[in-house]
Design a protein with these regions (language model features):
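C-terminal target-recognition/interaction regions appended to catalytic cores
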Residues: 33-193
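Residues that flank catalytic or metal-binding motifs in active/ligand-binding sites
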Residues: 26, 92, 236
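Soluble or luminal CAZymes and related metallo-dependent hydrolases
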Residues: 22, 149, 224
Length: 288
């Protein structure tokens, strides 16, 4: 932040926010989907091979695949033999990551989670639609900012900008920048209807969903992936630019659009580091 005060992050709680439902554990989030099929949007099960299913059968609820020496020889893995994990219905989920076969194993079924089950855990409602084939849907869900987290952050941002005192925490690595810029143009809550924001590297729109539920108004999204843009446009009525933000020309274009719209803040989930296995944009060597 460039305001002359420290931003405090939300205090942890497991409460729902507005129309975004919080679940206390995996079972509460997805148990009702166990007997349902593809009539539920994005509820598409992966067709695992017989070998993979046999491995899954050996994983206890809340546990991992046994070490290779304890497995039948024909289903042992040469690498990453202990990375298969099965969720527990009575615990919170491990982090949802992107990838067609990257989702954790269902608590009771011998398959990985469906995109919809993963989206439930990420706090997306069932009417929030992800686009493309199953692999693309898994990537969109795994890359998404959970709307519930975004909403609680946005609530703190709103109070922070309005100068309202609130309970919050200061992470060890947080900081603020004190500048000589003039922020007198930021209107008080009494003078504006709501905070306006732009969502860069928006993906399928988890950040936007959460911030809008907190009462903020998105004026522009920006994303380069075909299916993510399609999903964003499916779920929101405002404009989403399909644009590569690695070029200076496009950066200036988006900056002008946001300035013209008089946004109060910019949010975004930038891509992983260039050297990451998930990083498709390797135009910068972030190691150095």
């Amino acid at each position: 932040t460039m305001l002359d005060k420290q931003f405090l992050f939300p205090v942890f709680n497991a409460d729902s926010f507005g129309r975004i439902t919080a679940y206390k554990n995996v079972g509460e989030a997805i148990n009702d989907l166990t007997d349902k099929g593809e009539e539920v949007p994005n509820h598409i099960a992966l067709n695992h091979s017989d070998i993979v299913v046999r491995r899954y059968e050996l994983i206890p609820e809340g546990g991992k695949l046994p070490k290779p020496e304890f497995l039948p020889e024909d289903i042992r893995r040469k690498n990453f033999g202990n990375t298969y994990t099965r969720l527990s219905r009575n615990e919170v989920s491990s982090t949802i990551v992107p990838g067609n076969n990257a989702l954790p194993v269902h608590p009771t079924l011998n398959r990985s989670l469906t995109p919809r089950e993963a989206a439930r855990i990420q706090t997306f409602p069932d009417d929030y639609i992800f686009m493309g084939d199953r692999r693309s849907q898994c990537i969109q869900v795994g890359n998404a900012v959970p709307p519930l987290m975004a909403a609680k952050l946005a609530h703190c941002v709103d109070m922070y900008i309005d100068g309202i005192e609130y309970d919050g925490i200061q992470p060890d690595q947080s900081f603020y920048v004190n500048t000589d810029n003039d922020f007198s143009g930021i209107q008080s809550k009494a003078k504006r209807a709501t905070l306006k924001f732009g969502d860069l590297f928006s993906g399928a729109g988890g950040f936007t969903r959460g911030l809008e539920q907190a009462g903020l108004e998105c004026v522009l999204g920006a994303e380069w992936n075909d299916y993510a843009v399609e999903a964003y446009r499916k779920n929101f009525g405002h404009e989403c630019l399909q644009i590569d933000l690695s070029t200076e020309e496009n950066q200036e274009l988006v900056a002008k659009r946001l300035k013209d719209a008089h946004v109060d803040l910019v949010v975004g989930g930038p891509p992983c580091q260039g050297f990451s296995i998930f990083g498709n944009r390797r135009f910068v060597n972030t190691k150095s």
